[in-house]
Regions:
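Conserved serine/cysteine hydrolase catalytic core
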Residues: 187-237, 248
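Active-site loop/oxyanion-hole signature of alpha/beta-hydrolase fold enzymes
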Residues: 13, 20-23, 58-99, 263
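N-terminal cap/lid segment of alpha/beta-hydrolase-fold proteins
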Residues: 1-16
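Conserved alpha/beta-hydrolase catalytic His-Asp/Glu region
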Residues: 132-134, 152-211
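Flexible "cap/lid" loop of the alpha/beta hydrolase fold
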Residues: 112, 119-150
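Catalytic active-site module of serine/aspartate enzymes centered on a nucleophile-bearing elbow/loop
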Residues: 242-283
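Gly/Ala-rich beta-loop-alpha elbow adjacent to hydrolase catalytic centers
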Residues: 99, 103, 107
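Conserved HGGG/HGGXW glycine-rich cap/lid loop of the alpha/beta-hydrolase fold
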Residues: 15, 21-66
């Protein structure tokens, strides 16, 4: 593997969880959770930059990446409590959480349920609006009568189809191979249980948003065909202390514009989160 990430496994609540730890001595902690159907290697190209400003811990959430799953964790509310369990396991207090894609609703539930436990959030690219505003494969996954139809999805075709729109911005072949392996067997279909909980979970989240005073940096792709930017705008309009940056990308903003994405995180961690509600930027 050509990545800078040093990966290991740790047992948390009986599950083997894959993680990468920068082992730095910085006073601030940055905890990053994997997007789906990718893995913690989605942060590879910003790892060096971010490890210079904070100690990093990247996690494949249960059921995603290469971590073991447990069915009862496959909803944002349940995953939010597992996120807090991760922080306890690593003895991390007052972290910044970077939770794109499926991590977004879980991170928001964690902030709502544990005021003061999390210093700030960096989120986006995950469905959060209610009524739901989703499209493409995500819409199909949510609206299908069951998950059996997705058991035959070929992982390489799935990953290569997701990466095709970003062309040369796609990661190296060994990282693509990790994404493929992360969805082998029944992993993709079973992980779909998480997004299929959105119709019940997102109305609950919507009611909590005005009471989340944790600073929140939202990063969205302005051309996202799966999770339209209206999801980010929905959050920004309701969160009392948020900033929204819209990048000129599709869904995979963290891959397609990894430099800009990492720069926004760095600026946020270096004090941007202290500024308060700063409106919206487009780049």
């Amino acid at each position: 593997m050509s990545s800078e990430l040093k990966v290991g496994y740790r047992t948390v609540d009986g599950l083997q969880i894959r993680y990468a730890d920068s082992n730095g001595s910085a006073s601030q902690h940055l905890v990053l959770t994997s997007p789906w159907p990718e893995s913690l290697y989605a942060f590879d190209r910003m790892w060096s930059r971010l490890s210079g400003i904070a100690r990093l811990l990247a996690i494949d959430l249960p059921g995603f990446g290469r971590s073991e799953r447990r069915i009862d964790l496959l909803s944002p509310t349940a995953m939010s409590e597992f996120l807090i369990r991760i922080l306890d396991e690593w003895n991390i207090s007052d972290p910044h959480l970077v939770c794109p894609d499926v991590g977004t609703p879980a991170a928001l539930f964690a902030a709502a349920g544990h005021p003061g436990r999390i210093r700030s959030l960096v989120i986006g690219g995950g469905a959060t609006a209610y009524p739901l505003e989703v499209a493409g494969t995500l819409k199909d996954l949510i609206e299908a009568p069951g998950i059996d139809a997705f058991r035959s999805v070929e992982p390489r075709a799935l990953v290569e189809g997701l990466m095709a729109p970003i062309g040369p911005a796609a990661p190296a072949g060994d990282i693509i191979a990790d994404y493929v392996e992360s969805n082998m067997g029944d992993r993709f279909a079973e992980s779909a249980r998480y997004v299929r909980s959105y119709p019940e979970q997102l109305p609950l989240l919507a009611g909590l948003l005005p009471r989340i005073f944790t600073p929140v940096q939202i990063i969205a792709g302005g051309r996202d065909p799966i999770v339209p930017v209206t999801n980010a705008e929905f959050l920004h309009a309701r969160l009392p202390n948020s900033r929204l940056d819209v990048l000129d990308t599709g869904h995979l903003a963290w891959e397609e514009a990894s430099g800009e994405y990492g720069a926004i995180i760095a600026a946020w961690v270096n004090g941007g989160y202290l500024v308060g509600n700063t409106g919206m930027g487009r780049t």
